[in-house]
Amino acid sequence: MKQSKGSRNYVFYAQHPEKEEEVPSWHEIKQTPVIMATIKGPGPAKYLRSSCTGYIAHDISMFQEPAYSLHTRHTKKRIIDINSPGPCYFLNPKVTRFGISTCPQVPMEERISNPRINCMPASCKYNLEKTRPSGERQPPQYTFGYRCPYRVMDPNPAPNQYQLPVTLGTNIPVFRAAPSYSLASTNKNWFHKENIAGGPGPAMHTRPEPSVYQNRSPLFSMAKRFGCPLDHTHRPGPGSHDIQPVTVHKPRIPAFTMGIKHSPHLCPLIVDICD
């Protein structure tokens, strides 16, 4: 087909528009039909819906329930063990949630000496006779100082001697606790739970058959069913027959033809059937 009024570029909505190119009016434009079935888009699994479980990446269009954190289960040793924690777990009683709460304190130190007296040693305190010249070689010397004094024995107990109260149970007066229930032993005052008489009950005696104290009805014996006689001779099964050598009565072995793969965009044949 020829264009008489300028050049036209047809754009299909199924594809992205291409760059327009100027085509001379005397050239013929060959249009290729677009098959809509060949345009494939992402499937439903491409768009993932936000999770409705948890609080991370939760769907904003859904209501979020309160989340609870699961901690490890405390062992029985932590409750029964009498050992207290170390000094690092000592709670300073002066530290509150508002800060340090203390009363005014005055430090008690040793008496200050007279500041007018100079404590610097005089020149006569230095012994220069034993000092050698700086350029002279001499062996290494070691000085022995005073022995360090021992640590003052503190009669107060250490922090690890205090045992922190157990926070589990209802025996703590400073903590709020839920009601607890105690399980008592089985009550032995009920007679139906104990064998007071020491003898067998009515259920221990079996009930006699009615034919013992009444007229006996006729009885019939049912024997087993005899089987029908069968032929147990060996017969060949389906696998014993060889069906390949069919050239005895046929010209050749049956074969199957493999056709071409049909296009998935081929329109099926629809025939209207009139009733």
Swiss-Prot record:
Pfam families assigned: SHIPPO-rpt (PF07004)
Domain of life where this protein originates: Eukaryota
Residue ranges that the Swiss-Prot or TrEMBL entry lists as coiled coil: none
STPGR repeat placement: 200-225, 236-261
PANTHER family: OUTER DENSE FIBER PROTEIN 3-LIKE PROTEIN 1, SHIPPO-1-RELATED
The family this protein is said to belong to: Belongs to the CIMAP family.
Name of the protein this chain belongs to: Protein CIMAP1C
Source species of the chain: Mus musculus
Lineage of source species: Eukaryota, Metazoa, Chordata, Craniata, Vertebrata
